[in-house]
Amino acid sequence: MQFKQDFFTQLPEFYSQVYPQGLSHPQWLAWSHDAAQLIGLTQPTDELLLGLSGNAAIDGATYYAQVYSGHQFGGYTPRLGDGRSIILGEAIGPNGAWDVALKGGGPTPYSRHGDGRAVMRSAVREFLVSEALYHLHVPTTRALAVIGSDMPVWRESQETAAITVRLARSHIRFGHFEFFCHSERGRADKLLQLLNFTITQHYPHLSCDPSGYKAWFLQVVQDTAKMIAHWQAVGFAHGVMNTDNMSILGDSFDFGPFAFLDTFQEDFICNHSDPEGRYAFGQQPGVGLWNLQRLAQALTPVIPSDDLIAILNQYQEALVQTYLLLMRAKLGLTTLDKSTAEQDKQDLELIGQFTVLMEKNQLDYAQTWRQFGQLDPRSQHSSLRDDFIDTHQFDTWYKAYQLRLGDVTDIAAWQTERNSVNPKYILRNYLAQEAIIAVEEGNLAPLQRLQQVLSRPFAEQVEHDELAKRPPDWGQGLIMSCSS
């Protein structure tokens, strides 16, 4: 790997230098060839294993943990930082640079009495979801590899330590800006320095002046809205949408007790530590705006409040338009050249009525959408109908859907298009759990198979049909803990 060190050299007050503590008897558990290509790597080598497990220095790496703060479950925590993630620098790839971070690399000055380690199950889950979201076309950070070990760590019980090697276009979070506004009061110079660095590095088309700052914040608002619209369309619940887990670039970031929906449930909670459902699936769009409001509050020393409010008011439109684009594609509705407010309203009602029917009839979210690839929309009798207990309500919806759909002349092409946007395979929690259990038993084959299948989620892959089935009773709607 070839590194540059722009963050390290230009923002010395934004991190602490710290070196990883090596895993004992490291071994490759997973490797993403797609992600490796981003930074010019090809194969997982023994030399690379030693370096990424913290047992040998990597040429050009600097090793540091970033400092930031954030709102966690609505309350402000003045000092957080990378408690177990150590960044090596920005690896230069054929199409840009990517931060390389060792998540689980050992304690840092921000570990808050923690051991700085990640357990194997959380490392595998983060790897799988990073790559699964990417192949579902959801904006996300990436995962290069998982490295296992025989090092014991204690959570609820004894487990083994592992490292997820994360790739990110940037690790700058909403919480970085909050830290230098709230926790380091009087450091508006550092806030401005961070803002100028972010624009120069990631928005080079913008200027570092008042007009550029406003244009940048608008881009952040729009990118965040688009990311969350993708989550809602694909049925993804993040679980811990604290502001320190929000990427400034609008990439899905810092995965913990996440879940993809099995049965559609608007108020689904995937996080055992969120009994009130602050971060429930249906709450995510509102939380996204709340988090952006906290970011805006931190930016008041450099951007006038009236401008920030005006930009925040554009969040809903960006969210709705992206959501409509994605959901119209799932339904096969014509994307209008000039969408009117009335048409948008009608389409949102049509989509909302269908998801309400899915919830009332306890239908599987992914499987139901996938059936549109077998649907003949010209037929008066939908093949979907048998899945609904209340067939009368479905018939009413289906008539409205057919009216909005209009004439479909090439049925085969229409069905192929539906299969290209409605995945057959998603990362169901029970599938991840089965792969983790197999890894604990020394068998990597189920993990490798699951990774391979999730890299082609829209393909039929009939030999893997069982991975597309609804979960067994024990695996339905699993709620995960934040323990990692």
Curated annotation (Swiss-Prot):
Q: Which domain of life is it from?
A: Bacteria
Recorded E.C. number(s)? 2.7.7.-, 2.7.7.108
Which EC class is the enzyme in?
Answer: transferase
Where Mg(2+) is bound, by residue? N245, D254
Q: Which GO terms describe its molecular function?
A: AMPylase activity; ATP binding; magnesium ion binding
The active site is formed by D244
Keyword Metal-binding assigned to the entry: answer is yes
Give one Pfam hit by family name.
SelO
Regions crossing the membrane: none
Matches recorded under InterPro entries: SelO (IPR003846)
Q: Which cofactor does it need?
A: Mg(2+); Mn(2+)
Look up keyword Ribosomal protein and say if it applies: no
Q: Which residues bind ATP?
A: G81, G83, R84, K103, D115, G116, R166, R173, D254
Keywords per UniProt: ATP-binding, Magnesium, Manganese, Metal-binding, Nucleotide-binding, Nucleotidyltransferase, Transferase
Catalytic activity entry:
L-seryl-[protein] + ATP = 3-O-(5'-adenylyl)-L-seryl-[protein] + diphosphate; L-threonyl-[protein] + ATP = 3-O-(5'-adenylyl)-L-threonyl-[protein] + diphosphate; L-tyrosyl-[protein] + ATP = O-(5'-adenylyl)-L-tyrosyl-[protein] + diphosphate; L-histidyl-[protein] + UTP = N(tele)-(5'-uridylyl)-L-histidyl-[protein] + diphosphate
Its function, per the record, reads: Nucleotidyltransferase involved in the post-translational modification of proteins. It can catalyze the addition of adenosine monophosphate (AMP) or uridine monophosphate (UMP) to a protein, resulting in modifications known as AMPylation and UMPylation.
NCBIfam families the UniProt entry points to: PRK00029.1
Q: Which family does it belong to?
A: Belongs to the SELO family.
Identification of the protein by name: Protein nucleotidyltransferase YdiU
